[in-house]
């Protein structure tokens, strides 16, 4: 594949599903994966023989829950002892371990224990999205815009960028999901004067509310709020708990400790939840759920709404908070935009509509695809796409949390206020606290609390060599500079000597080192090569199997009676049966062995078959265009649990 210089893709890397789009020929194409789905599960599975990503991984989760990793987005950029990580670990079937304060996922792959950083798991999903785009475009793609929740802090953004690098992508920019949705929306709404838009994004794992003003192609984010831990999965959890209780009542058995049963129940619950968005009742039918018991039951929409009532109602709190932060009355909002699959739930729509006094909600954008759509447009802008559609679009993003430093008494002195438009640069003069102080410790924090101890320490550095002077005399100029990706540079300069020191907050708290990233890039290539070998092996195995079965059916064809000698027929059948028995006993053989076996079989069969067909043919198998030696490559059908 040749790389096309000018193409960049937009990737919505979601907690539960991901989506990829590209802007070409003046419009956005959302790209379907190899299964024909326009969204791909953010799942990676490891087995004894291979690594699976996307639909294939999610489809086998019931059989292999310990080694199927999802929700990497909940781990990325966090510390192991983060309360979010600790509480989520209780719900995950896979094991999370602590390595130097960072969480790693422990799985068994090809018979060995392996531990992966969340960045590596996310990079595998990004690789899948990259390959999906490449299959559609027909050439290699390296440039991408990746989206993150507005609430992500600096280390989470940086870790997401690292995941892109490991996947072999050049990450042009990390942008906020609601901002991306606003772009998708803004394209359709160009030229209507200033509009205030509220974006309500309830996805599989995160919930974001953002208020933007769109004016003449300029987007400005006024406020963001939300809950990093609310989404479709939480609604699934409520259904799972409900049915676990029902199973207890009906069958006096507790299935909650059986991971496979719970996983199968969860899959059925997710399906039921989707059904309830369009029907008032959904049926669940799970054969042999636990100890041979079939579980057939149903749930009404009303019951589902009751089970999730507090979660649904809770979605309005961030709406109110965002309005307060934007200093805006709800009557001032022109448009309410729904993003994320969970916004299809009728009750969620009703609550939001009632809150805005019956206003129409905007559902014109497919809620699953809006974010990737916007990311694809942003990617085109950054690559210098000259088409009229994207020419006049300017994007102003915001800092999700206030940034500042610690001053005397542990006070948080804010330099960049939360919701400030980025990129931005703020400078302030500070001084010494005691006489003849030789240096100052600059400690950088993010957060909204008055005292730094309640906020999040991003990094610290010393500025030394300050000439002796009474307290309050030295002038130390501190500059906070955030770039368009939300990455922070802090510089401190002593005005009298010109001595300076700086820090780029790319996070000591969980940032991967350059060496680690390089190692992971190499690992990713190695895994990809292994996946390729595995695919070739399976193709060779299938080719042998198909050839043997085709030969057996060819010589057993009624139409060939009398045309083939019994000796020849027996020879072929014996050889085919021998090959099939060998195959049965050597499922894990190498590609060369399968190929060798097939060639061996062909040497016996082909001369007989060729002689047969050259000798004229009148049977029903004539004229079917069957060519000996060409293995059938039909679809593989598998049951999904």
From Swiss-Prot:
GO terms for molecular function: ATP binding; ATP hydrolysis activity; ATP-dependent protein folding chaperone; heat shock protein binding; protein folding chaperone; ubiquitin protein ligase binding; unfolded protein binding. Molecular chaperone implicated in a wide variety of cellular processes, including protection of the proteome from stress, folding and transport of newly synthesized polypeptides, activation of proteolysis of misfolded proteins and the formation and dissociation of protein complexes. Plays a pivotal role in the protein quality control system, ensuring the correct folding of proteins, the re-folding of misfolded proteins and controlling the targeting of proteins for subsequent degradation. This is achieved through cycles of ATP binding, ATP hydrolysis and ADP release, mediated by co-chaperones. Keywords: ATP-binding, Chaperone, Nucleotide-binding, Stress response. Belongs to the heat shock protein 70 family. One of its GO terms (cellular component) is nucleus. Interacts with PRKN. GO terms for biological process: binding of sperm to zona pellucida; chaperone cofactor-dependent protein refolding; positive regulation of protein targeting to mitochondrion; protein refolding. Residues 396-511 are annotated as: Substrate-binding domain (SBD). It holds the Pfam family HSP70. The N-terminal nucleotide binding domain (NBD) (also known as the ATPase domain) is responsible for binding and hydrolyzing ATP. The C-terminal substrate-binding domain (SBD) (also known as peptide-binding domain) binds to the client/substrate proteins. The two domains are allosterically coupled so that, when ATP is bound to the NBD, the SBD binds relatively weakly to clients. When ADP is bound in the NBD, a conformational change enhances the affinity of the SBD for client proteins. It comes from the Eukaryota. This is Heat shock 70 kDa protein 1-like. InterPro entries: ATPase_NBD, Heat_shock_70_CS, HSP70_C_sf, HSP70_peptide-bd_sf, Hsp_70_fam. Residues 3-388 are annotated as: Nucleotide-binding domain (NBD). ATP binds at residues 14-17, 73, 204-206, 270-277, 341-344. Gene3D superfamilies: 1.20.1270.10, 3.30.30.30, 3.30.420.40, Actin, Chain A, domain 4, Substrate Binding Domain Of DNAk, Chain A, domain 1.
């Amino acid at each position: 594949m040749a790389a096309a210089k000018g193409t960049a893709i937009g990737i919505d890397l979601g907690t539960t599903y991901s989506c990829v789009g590209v802007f070409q020929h003046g419009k956005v194409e959302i790209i379907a994966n190899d299964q024909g789905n326009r969204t791909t599960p953010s799942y990676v599975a490891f087995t004894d023989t291979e690594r699976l990503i996307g639909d294939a991984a999610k489809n086998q989760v019931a059989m292999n829950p310990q080694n199927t990793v999802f929700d990497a987005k909940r781990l990325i950029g966090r510390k192991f002892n983060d309360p979010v990580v600790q509480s989520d670990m209780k719900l995950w079937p896979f094991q999370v371990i602590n390595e130097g304060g960072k969480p790693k996922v422990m799985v068994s792959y090809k018979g060995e224990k392996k531990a992966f950083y969340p960045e590596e798991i996310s990079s595998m999903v990004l690789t899948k999205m990259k390959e999906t785009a490449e299959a559609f475009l027909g050439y290699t793609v390296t440039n991408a815009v990746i989206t993150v929740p507005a609430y992500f802090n600096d280390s989470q953004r940086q870790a997401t960028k690292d995941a892109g690098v490991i996947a072999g992508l050049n990450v042009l920019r990390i942008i906020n999901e609601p901002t991306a949705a606003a772009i998708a929306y803004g394209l359709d709404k160009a030229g209507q004067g200033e509009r205030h838009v509220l974006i309500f994004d309830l996805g599989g794992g995160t919930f974001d509310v953002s208020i933007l003003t769109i004016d003449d192609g300029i987007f400005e984010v006024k406020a963001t709020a939300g809950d990093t831990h609310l989404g479709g999965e939480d609604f699934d959890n409520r259904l799972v708990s409900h049915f676990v209780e029902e199973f207890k009542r009906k069958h006096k058995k507790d299935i909650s400790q059986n991971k496979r049963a719970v996983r199968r129940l969860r899959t059925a619950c997710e399906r039921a939840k989707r059904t309830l968005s369009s029907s008032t009742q959904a049926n669940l039918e799970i054969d042999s759920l636990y100890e041979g018991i079939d579980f057939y039951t149903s749930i009404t929409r009303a019951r589902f709404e009751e089970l999730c009532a507090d979660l649904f109602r809770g979605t309005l709190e961030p709406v109110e908070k965002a309005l307060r932060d934007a200093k805006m009355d709800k009557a001032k909002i022109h448009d309410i935009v729904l993003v994320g699959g969970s916004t299809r739930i009728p009750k969620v729509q009703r609550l939001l509509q009632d809150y805005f006094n019956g206003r129409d909600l905007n559902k014109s954008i497919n809620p699953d695809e809006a974010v990737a759509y916007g990311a694809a447009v942003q990617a085109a802008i950054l690559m210098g796409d000259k088409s009229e559609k994207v020419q006049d679009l300017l994007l102003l993003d915001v800092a999700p949390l206030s940034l500042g430093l610690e001053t005397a008494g542990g006070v948080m002195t804010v330099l960049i206020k939360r919701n400030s438009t980025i990129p931005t640069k703020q400078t302030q003069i500070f001084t010494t606290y005691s006489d003849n102080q030789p240096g100052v410790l600059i400690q950088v924090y993010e957060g909204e609390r008055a005292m730094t101890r309640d906020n999040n320490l991003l990094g610290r550095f010393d500025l030394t060599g300050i000439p002796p002077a009474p307290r309050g005399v030295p002038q130390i100029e501190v500059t906070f500079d955030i770039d368009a990706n939300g990455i922070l540079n802090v510089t401190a300069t002593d005005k009298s000597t010109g001595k300076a020191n700086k820090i780029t907050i790319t996070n000591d708290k969980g940032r991967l080192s350059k060496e680690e990233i390089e190692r992971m890039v190499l690992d990713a290539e190695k895994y990809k090569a292994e996946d390729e070998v595995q695919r070739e092996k399976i193709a060779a195995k299938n080719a042998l199997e198909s050839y043997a079965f085709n030969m057996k059916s060819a010589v057993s064809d009624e139409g060939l009676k009398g045309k083939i000698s019994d000796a020849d027929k027996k020879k072929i059948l014996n050889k085919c049966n021998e090959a099939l028995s060998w195959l049965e006993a050597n499922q894990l053989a190498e590609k060369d062995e399968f190929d060798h076996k097939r060639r061996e079989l062909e040497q016996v069969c082909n001369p007989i078959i060729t002689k047969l067909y050259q000798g004229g043919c009148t049977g029903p198998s004539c004229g079917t265009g069957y060519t000996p030696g060409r293995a059938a490559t039909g679809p593989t059908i598998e049951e999904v649990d």
